[in-house]
Design a protein with these regions (language model features):
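Charged, low-complexity, helix/coiled-coil-prone segments
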Residues: 1-9, 42-49
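Short intrinsically disordered terminal tails
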Residues: 1-5, 68-75
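N-terminal acidic leader/helix
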Residues: 2-35
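Short, charge-rich amphipathic interface segments used for partner binding and complex assembly
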Residues: 32-73
C-alpha cells in the first residue's frame, strides 16, 4: 500500500467514525425523547403529535430499508 493510499484510508476511516459518532448521538437523543413520549401531553389532543410521529417513523423506516435493502431498495 502506498503512503497516499494509506493516508486516504486513514482519512476515510476518520470521516466514517466521526459520522458514526454523530449518528449514535442522534439515536441516543431520539431514544431519550421516545422514553419521554416525545414530550406529548396526554391531557391534550394528540393529533399533531401523532402526525409528526408518523412522518418521523416513515423517515426512519426508509433509512432502515436502505441499510437492510428492503422494499424499494431490495436487490
Amino acid at each position: 500500500m502506498t503512503d497516499r493510499t494509506a493516508r486516504n484510508q486513514e482519512n476515510s476511516l476518520a470521516a466514517f467514525l466521526a459520522k458514526k459518532a454523530e449518528f449514535d448521538a442522534l439515536l441516543a437523543e431520539l431514544t431519550q425523547a421516545s422514553a419521554d413520549h416525545f414530550g406529548a401531553d396526554p391531557e391534550t389532543g394528540l393529533w399533531g403529535e401523532a402526525a409528526w410521529l408518523s412522518d418521523a417513523t416513515a423517515k426512519l423506516k426508509d433509512i432502515a430499508d436502505q441499510h437492510f435493502r428492503r422494499g424499494e431498495y431490495a436487490a
